[in-house]
Design a protein with these regions (language model features):
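A short, basic N-terminal segment
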Residues: 1-41
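Mid-core helix/loop region of P-loop NTP-binding domains shared across ATPases and GTPases
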Residues: 3-4, 82-85, 97-140
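Conserved NTP-binding/hydrolysis module of P-loop NTPases
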Residues: 8-11, 71-73, 81-100
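Walker A/P-loop nucleotide-binding motif
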Residues: 41-61
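Short glycine-/polar-rich loops that comprise or flank the Walker A/P-loop
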Residues: 42-43, 68-72, 122-123, 140
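Residues at the beta-strand->loop junction immediately N-terminal to the Walker
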Residues: 48, 77, 128
Length: 140
């Protein structure tokens, strides 16, 4: 309705904005570069910020710009996550049927990540978006 009135070519501010149309100010570009550095060196990072500052947008940008020949990004955004479901969701993204035993599923995930790196040279990058909503059990 308002798109026609303002002569917009698409609805603004949707989550489906193509990556090439995202506004990337220098601050977000720097964060993206730092996250790529973390992925290159197999490090752990925590990205925090106020609501609406672009955290999820940066993760979308990262998922689209990481070289797929070198990286496989696994993404989870589930505030009701349990350790067993965490491993199951990641293994599903790798195309592996997960054990319902949390300890076995954890080993499966570690093995799959090691195989991907050793055989294919692909680093697995795990992203848990909205992790501030996770339970204490999940954070352990």
């Amino acid at each position: 309705m308002y798109e026609g009135f303002y002569e917009l070519s698409s609805t603004p501010f949707t989550k489906g904005i193509p990556i090439e149309k995202l506004f990337m100010p220098p601050e977000l570009t720097e964060i993206s570069d730092r996250l790529e550095y973390v992925a290159q060196r197999h490090l752990f990072a925590v990205l925090t910020g106020e609501c609406g500052t672009g955290k999820s947008t940066i993760l979308r940008h990262m998922s689209e710009t990481l070289d797929p020949r070198k990286y496989r990004m696994l993404y989870i955004s589930d505030s009701k996550l349990t350790p067993t479901n965490f491993y199951r969701l990641l293994l599903e993204q790798l195309g592996v049927a997960a054990s319902w035993n949390s300890a076995v599923a954890k080993r499966q995930l570690q093995e799959q990540m090691s195989i991907k790196l050793a055989v294919d040279g692909i680093t697995t990058v795990c992203v848990v978006d909205e992790s501030h909503l996770l339970s204490y059990a999940m954070l352990e």
